[in-house]
Amino acid sequence: MASGLIDTNFSSTLANGMSGCDQSTVESLADDPTDSPFDADDCLKVRKYWCFLLSSIFTFLAGLLVVLLWRAFAFVCCRKEPDLGPNDPKQKEQKASRNKQEFEGTFMTEAKDWAGELISGQTTTGRILVVLVFILSIASLIIYFVDASSEEVERCQKWSNNITQQIDLAFNIFFMVYFFIRFIAASDKLWFMLEMYSFVDYFTIPPSFVSIYLDRTWIGLRFLRALRLMTVPDILQYLNVLKTSSSIRLAQLVSIFISVWLTAAGIIHLLENSGDPLDFNNAHRLSYWTCVYFLIVTMSTVGYGDVYCETVLGRTFLVFFLLVGLAMFASSIPEIIELVGSGNKYGGELKREHGKRHIVVCGHITYESVSHFLKDFLHEDREDVDVEVVFLHRKPPDLELEGLFKRHFTTVEFFQGTIMNPIDLQRVKVHEADACLVLANKYCQDPDAEDAANIMRVISIKNYSDDIRVIIQLMQYHNKAYLLNIPSWDWKQGDDVICLAELKLGFIAQSCLAPGFSTMMANLFAMRSFKTSPDMQSWTNDYLRGTGMEMYTETLSPTFIGIPFAQATELCFSKLKLLLLAIEIKGAEEGADSKISINPRGAKIQANTQGFFIAQSADEVKRAWFYCKACHEDIKDETLIKKCKCKNLTVQPRSKFDDLDEHHPAPTFTPPELPKRVHVRGSVSGDITRDREDTNLLNRNVRRPNGTGNGTGGMHHMNNTAAAAAAAAAAGKQVNKVKPTVNVSRQVEGQVISPSQYNRPTSRSSGTGTQNQNGGVSLPAGIADDQSKDFDFEKTEMKYDSTGMFHWSPAKSLEDCILDRNQAAMTVLNGHVVVCLFADPDSPLIGLRNLVMPLRASNFHYHELKHVVIVGSVDYIRREWKMLQNLPKISVLNGSPLSRADLRAVNVNLCDMCCILSAKVPSNDDPTLADKEAILASLNIKAMTFDDTIGVLSQRGPEFDNLSATAGSPIVLQRRGSVYGANVPMITELVNDSNVQFLDQDDDDDPDTELYLTQPFACGTAFAVSVLDSLMSTTYFNQNALTLIRSLITGGATPELELILAEGAGLRGGYSTVESLSNRDRCRVGQISLYDGPLAQFGECGKYGDLFVAALKSYGMLCIGLYRFRDTSSSCDASSKRYVITNPPDDFSLLPTDQVFVLMQFDPGLEYKPPAVRAPAGGRGTNTQGSGVGGGGSNKDDNS
């Protein structure tokens, strides 16, 4: 109804508007049979512009009036009637009226819905109509450009001869129909009448009809069609052309700017060419394009002055327009330039070169993390790295990071996007990538939130491509379970987790067994180049040479096939100058998983065996593949071993090392069944010769908790049970009635086989019985005899976890393991591990299980396990206890690591290692303060002094001095107690690398020095999680490298054990089986002293190469480096600090004070049995094995 009224009104308005116009010209033209042209000058003497203008105004006012009248009528006539009661007689009439209104309402609603669908962009018809309206609007605008190119504003021309007006009229008829459709679809008719696009129609449609009646044209306000350009962004979105916010914003800015510019130019053109009213005699002739030029120059505030407004109306409009136009120009143009300049800088799609691999790196992308990653990934020591590194991050790089990318532009590319968006994954071609690496923020405030974000990234990657290889960094060990439970996660396909907490604590744990080992391993998997200098100290040059060593893999040449591992290692070291650490042993069955075996006992090299080497570069390791006996046997210079032309590589030649088999006897396999045991106790004559044999026997079979055996090269092999029993009895007398449980031999088909065919040299100090200064009485490590009454060793059975890799005990409550200061002070702890833990009750869990588990590896005998004493907040430890309750020999002192009384109570001066850890979250305010507690604790211990009393400085008795004069005798096993805190073995965990300068007061480290070059790190007394950054690159290039490193530092954690722990139930105990007990027979880390014992001969001016060969042949131990005093002078102010030398050359001179890092075999030999009879009174001075380091539970070893 409203639309009909509008149509009628529109026609009447046109007629009424024309009634006042002069029709004489029109009539004369109509009467002219020849259709002669107008006399233009006579026609234009009378201006008719107001007719065109009034038609537009009247149309607007008429439409507005109709809408207002309709609303008033609806308000008066259609008011809501009051509800009538059910019995009211007018109710029927009301119902009929309502039904009629509902029918009309339904009809109007359907019409409105139809019109709405027709003009919306949601349907195909709507999209076509919207695009058609835009195209016709632009076509009408082009017609205006054509008409406005002349300087005439009003022109007399017969309509039938005016082609442009005829075309424009056809367009306007279409716009009029579209106007009515929009009017019907509008929910608020009054507001619709006041819309901008409605005014465009008011001032463009009616004048086209007026021109027919007057036979003249007025340029008028047709330039308003330019405002239709503002709909370009909407139309492009309807057509799915614009999808990103930046492109939509750019289209909006450009369309608004151009629309306003062209519209304002049309107004200036109209006003200047018309002149000022009322006589219009000062017209300023300007073309439309000149006006366009004039406006852009004016808006940009340049204003050349070559074009300007002369009319009053033109100038007035310009004044007001500049207030808007200048602001728009100043805001829009910079934003447009920014969007155009940066829109596609890091967008687009990866263009892969044919045959070139690429990896995608995401997660925590900053200058620091990226620079560390690229420094290691693109290191020159690697073989030609033909891999492109693609970084994907949601934020654009800052200037520093952008500069880094430019310096590596040939191998690095950055894309802006998120790993959670499949479109961005498609852009960087994740499905074609070689691997996807996820970096973590090591300094984050919330480690669990950081891990959750990275795990979600892995889920997104695996959801997009489930066969892509993923290597991820995680902060917390307990979050590893969520990752392992992802269905498409498969470690067999190369997926790997680098858990920073697990590896960090594992490195620290191994340093408890062999101080300095954390530094050695960290340097091995980091790619570094070393440069020695004569200006530097000798110890610095020795250390730097070791930092240049890395771990590589290479396939062994056919020359090695069939020879034992020890023999192959000797050949590599002496001939190729390579250190062979481990080999990959393939499964016996086809398709079975291969495993990495470190220093395997009795394994022989098979064809295509992959070896793990320590060397300076990948080129050096190639010698292992190039080596050929026929071509290279006589070559003395290892650098000359190159690829030969020998074709007979398939035939295995007999190596000159084959005659060494007699020096490498096959190791004895220890059966899992219960062995025969000999319990002997008695008195034997004490001549010195027999005592020497007894001491050798005891120390050969009672190994230290630090991980090495105690036998000597000169000891006698026991050939029968009786001799062994007598010797054990004498040993029992020697060590204060300690009753050993001896497994001297086992019977196999009537023959007696010795427990281990490798002799055992003594290792670094530890906690079992040694001589003290009072008459050679033993001072075993552990708890005093009066503290051991609660432990019944005969009735307790020792168990392992279900995999057989770790010692296990039934769950203990935390309260049973808590000591107060008095209880700790009454406990003579020795050879133990003190963990100084700084934590608040709500601090994030760091996973203390990862520190204790390597110290509970099953390749230690039970009595060798070091007691772990944790000093810290018991409220925090209670949260960790669920993961510690099944691990034996743990005590907790609820105290402060900064309290000297607490430190004295736990005998920190007698410990084998003091670990200083912090679980507190670093502050954002000042990151350097994150390590304040750890540094204070370290300096506090170094400033302490201790009494030189019994049990502090253990000295050798005279009888022992006589024994040690022979080649076969052991060294003093117990670490001498420290009188000064500076000599306490210590390792401090740091969050910030730069804080390492505060640990040692006697060094001259520069704050800008890299961590690995600082003295505390070189000495193995500091460790920071940043050194683990290199593992990402190492794991990518060598899938087995992380497995090897994890095996070395975790004590034997396997993927199967990881899956068990991922269940969340913790370690599960298991019955010993043949398979699980065989897992005990694996290599471990140890430290051997050259001061005394069977290897002492090499300490006096010996060479490292001779030591290496002798240790490998005689004891099956693989030497990997030295731990040497920094100051080798005997001056009184010489430092007691040692530093790490990784894999010295074979001609390297040794010193008696050196300690050797070794990978030693498992010793299944004689077990140690604590006494059943209490020691005589004297108590703490004659401490026996208790629940301290050597006691606390069962020590019955079913596999000995």
Swiss-Prot record:
Residues 828-848 are annotated as: Segment S9. It is a multi-pass membrane protein. A motif (Selectivity for potassium) lies at residues 301-304. It is found in: Membrane. Keywords: Calcium, Ion channel, Ion transport, Membrane, Phosphoprotein, Potassium, Potassium channel, Potassium transport, Transmembrane, Transmembrane helix, Transport, Voltage-gated channel. Phosphorylated. Phosphorylation may be mediated by both PKA and SRC kinases, which activate the channel activity. Phosphorylation by PKA is however unclear. Indeed, although modulation of channel activity requires Pka-C1, it does not interact with the whole PKA holoenzyme. Moreover, modulation of activity does not depend upon phosphorylation of Ser-978. One of its GO terms (cellular component) is neuronal cell body. Homotetramer; which constitutes the calcium-activated potassium channel. Interacts with Slip1. Interacts with Slob, and, indirectly with 14-3-3-zeta via its interaction with Slob. Interacts with Pka-C1 and Src kinases, which can bind simultaneously to it. Potassium channel activated by both membrane depolarization or increase in cytosolic Ca(2+) that mediates export of K(+). Its activation dampens the excitatory events that elevate the cytosolic Ca(2+) concentration and/or depolarize the cell membrane. It therefore contributes to repolarization of the membrane potential. Kinetics are determined by alternative splicing, phosphorylation status and its combination interaction with Slob and 14-3-3-zeta. While the interaction with Slob1 alone increases its activity, its interaction with both Slob1 and 14-3-3-zeta decreases its activity. This is Calcium-activated potassium channel slowpoke.
